[in-house]
């Protein structure tokens, strides 16, 4: 059973529960993604990195995070 202080989102196609009031920055920080090596999409819209601290997560949001890895 999910606690009342959590909301359900989809992260990269998988269901994830996050705290109510969480923002995109807190999610990325919790997942340990380096901001300079990711692209973020929320509900099919690209998110500017400078705005992620202001973007709240809401129930049923679809978040896609792409992590870039260098190689040769």
Short names for language-model regions:
Residues 1-71:
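Ubiquitin-like/PB1-type beta-grasp interaction modules and other compact soluble beta-rich domains
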């Amino acid at each position: 059973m999910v606690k009342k202080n959590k909301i359900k989102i989809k992260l990269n196609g998988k269901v994830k529960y996050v705290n109510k009031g969480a923002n995109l920055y807190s999610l990325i920080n919790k997942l340990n993604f380096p901001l300079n090596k990711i692209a973020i999409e929320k509900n099919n819209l690209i998110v500017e990195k400078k705005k992620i601290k202001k973007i709240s997560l809401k129930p049923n949001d679809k978040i896609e995070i792409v992590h870039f890895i260098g190689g040769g």
